[in-house]
């Protein structure tokens, strides 16, 4: 018994479809983009949390990295705690923003999202010229 896709000459599996390479590349690029945004958010959250901790108790923050009787928490453990909270805020913030944009656009799949973004933003012109030859560009005259 043949599958439904075999009668038309098309593969039965969606992973073997001709456009699947482009879809997979799109998903990888999207993942890299979201990872970069998340990393930037984590860095911003870490810096913000660290600056708030320094503002709240600067004398404890500026003392050494060893915990003493006067300092119940070392600077490194304070920084790790700030990193943890900053990371949590960054991941939650990116998730909430992504979810809000997804719902505001009313899309149901990545293909819908891509077509919606292409309709909103202008197209990027492709350069038909070859890549810049740096040796010619940087050659002294």
From Swiss-Prot:
Record-linked Pfam families: DUF1358
Recorded family membership: Belongs to the TMEM242 family.
Mitochondrial intermembrane side: 51-81
N-acetylmethionine: residues bearing it: 1
The protein's name: Transmembrane protein 242
Localisation: Mitochondrion inner membrane
Stretches assigned to the Mitochondrial matrix side: 1-29, 103-141
Function according to Swiss-Prot or TrEMBL: Scaffold protein that participates in the c-ring assembly of mitochondrial ATP synthase (F(1)F(0) ATP synthase or complex V) by facilitating the membrane insertion and oligomer formation of the subunit c/ATP5MC3. Participates in the incorporation of the c-ring into vestigial complexes. Additionally influences the incorporation of subunits MT-ATP6, MT-ATP8, ATP5MJ, and ATP5MK in the ATP synthase.
Keywords: Acetylation, Membrane, Mitochondrion, Mitochondrion inner membrane, Transmembrane, Transmembrane helix
Annotated source species: Homo sapiens (Human)
Subunit structure of this chain's protein: Interacts with the core subunits NDUFAF1, ECSIT and ACAD9 of the MCIA complex. Interacts with ATP5MC3, NDUFC2, TMEM70, MT-ND2 and MT-ND3.
Membrane topology designation: Multi-pass membrane protein
GO CC aspect terms: mitochondrial inner membrane; mitochondrion
Transmembrane annotation, as ranges: 30-50, 82-102
Record-level GO BP terms: mitochondrial proton-transporting ATP synthase complex assembly
